[in-house]
Amino acid sequence: MRSSDQLSARQRDILGFIEEFTQEHGYPPSIREIQDGLRISSTSVVAYNLRALESKGLIDRDGRVSRGIKIKNMTPMPLSRAQGGRVPLLGVITAGQPLPNPEDTSTTAVEMIEVPVDLAPPEKLQNVYALKVRGHSMIDALIDDGDIVLMRYQETADNGQMVAVRIEDDNAVTLKRFYREGDKVRLQPANVTMEPIYVDAARVHIQGRVVGVLRSMW
């Protein structure tokens, strides 16, 4: 059981806010949302207290993404968004050469999109988020520019799975099929006109796996 011993009042408030926000929305809050939700004077104060919570073993953080906060041993509960067949649209992903991630997921207004029941039953939408596709590298997999991919958050993948990948140092995010080849990873486009991308495995961080597609009709 998680202990709250030696927590300041502010740290208890932040921990409670993160847990309530995550249960309600299905994804963790950004630092800005914590600041606004608790009326804290600055994001630096929030960041300081998040570091304290992490050092006390109560949360895990991935500082490379804006919503990289996880409460340890938190038991998932049914999400209100799942009952409505809705998932958060968290930004844009490139289906082409990797580009710096253009999304800004630190805003307080997160767009929610409807997922048809015949595509995914509401109870299957736990830990699922959406990204809008930019580019044509996955066209042979029937994913084109303007489509929306549904991503199940996970940090590992099997060979051949279609994943969102962040490339370290470049801070680039791309949508490709994943293949581990020794100490390299091959990021394979589904477009015969495009070449695969080879990256050191240590620089590749999986952000999620494609579990569905909402196709643009434009």
From Swiss-Prot:
Entry-linked InterPro entries: LexA, LexA-like, LexA/Signal_pep-like_sf, LexA_DNA-bd_dom, LexA_repressor, Peptidase_S24_LexA, Peptidase_S24_S26A/B/C, WH-like_DNA-bd_sf
EC assignment: 3.4.21.88
Site (Cleavage): 95-96
Enzyme class: hydrolase
UniProt entry tagged with the keyword DNA damage: yes
Cystine connections: none
Biological process (GO), any one: proteolysis
Single GO term (MF): DNA binding
Reactions that this protein is recorded to catalyse: Hydrolysis of Ala-|-Gly bond in repressor LexA
Keywords: Autocatalytic cleavage, DNA damage, DNA repair, DNA replication, DNA-binding, Hydrolase, Repressor, SOS response, Transcription, Transcription regulation
Catalytic center residues: 137, 176
DNA-binding region in chain numbering: 31-51
The keyword Oxidoreductase is annotated on this UniProt entry: no
Job of this protein: Represses a number of genes involved in the response to DNA damage (SOS response), including recA and lexA. In the presence of single-stranded DNA, RecA interacts with LexA causing an autocatalytic cleavage which disrupts the DNA-binding part of LexA, leading to derepression of the SOS regulon and eventually DNA repair.
Annotated family: Belongs to the peptidase S24 family.
Subunit and interaction comment: Homodimer.
Protein's recorded name: LexA repressor
Species per Swiss-Prot/TrEMBL record: Roseiflexus sp. (strain RS-1)
